[in-house]
């Protein structure tokens, strides 16, 4: 019997990628503006802004592999990947939401940016790994298409809504995204059930 992709579950899982794409699109659009203002009279301002904006890339090559590997070895009552999502996404939402509140102080904003990047690193790799964990091997290509669609929708939402909210108040895009991340965390906890044994992982079950 041919197995079919569970589209409702896959779209639900895609909310994690939706949140990631939304938050990073807003981050990359508006954080340089905040930095440009707070570093207005600083020598080598452009270089400093460029360096600060690489924090997520530094986290991507250092922290994300660590948390991804750690989630491979995790299993408890919350699942394998879900503990990292439940811990990281709300923290990421909190620190993301407060970034614009500290935009007049470089030290405070840097603290929020670093904390946000650390929190995002906790759940990003486990979120990516969750799709193949809950999807049969033959259906993973279809599921990946759904996931990428959800990520694209998150980026589009940032593009169409972010600037409008920013024009009302620079903090609104960040608060909006933070609230969505909290809601998405709750939805993922409610709707996604991880299997203890992963089908077809590396040619053998985990």
Model-based region annotation:
Residues 81-97:
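Structural signature of the two symmetry-related core transmembrane helices
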Residues 18, 92-123:
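Hydrophobic core of transmembrane alpha-helices in multi-pass small-molecule transporters
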Residues 171-190:
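Symmetry-related core transmembrane helices of the 12-TM Major Facilitator Superfamily/SLC fold
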Residues 33, 37, 100, 155-173:
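Transmembrane alpha-helix termini and helix-breaking/packing motifs in multi-pass membrane transporters
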Residues 60, 141-166:
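Glycine-rich segments within core transmembrane alpha-helices of 12-TM secondary carriers
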Residues 2-57:
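Helix-loop boundary and gating motifs at the non-cytosolic
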Residues 188-201:
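Helix-loop junctions on the cytosolic side of multi-pass membrane transporters
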Residues 49-74:
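Central cavity-lining transmembrane alpha-helices of secondary-active solute carriers
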């Amino acid at each position: 019997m041919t197995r079919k992709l569970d589209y409702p579950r896959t779209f639900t899982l895609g909310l994690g990628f939706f949140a990631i794409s939304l938050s990073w699109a807003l981050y990359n659009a508006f954080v340089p503006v905040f930095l440009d203002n707070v570093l207005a009279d600083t020598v080598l301002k452009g270089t400093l802004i460029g360096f600060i904006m690489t924090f997520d890339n530094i986290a991507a090559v250092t922290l994300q592999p660590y948390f991804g590997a750690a989630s491979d070895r995790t299993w408890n009552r919350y699942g394998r990947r879900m503990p990292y999502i439940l811990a990281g996404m709300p923290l990421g939402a909190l620190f993301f939401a407060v970034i614009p509140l500290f935009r007049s102080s470089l030290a405070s904003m840097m603290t929020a940016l670093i904390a946000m990047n650390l929190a995002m690193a906790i759940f990003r790799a486990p979120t990516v790994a969750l799709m193949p964990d809950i999807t049969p091997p033959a259906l993973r290509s279809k599921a990946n298409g759904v996931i990428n669609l959800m990520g694209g929708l998150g980026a589009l939402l940032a593009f169409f809504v972010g600037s409008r909210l920013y024009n009302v108040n620079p903090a609104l895009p960040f608060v909006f995204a933070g609230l969505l991340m909290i809601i998405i965390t709750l939805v993922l906890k409610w709707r996604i059930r991880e299997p203890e044994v992963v089908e077809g992982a590396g040619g053998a079950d985990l």
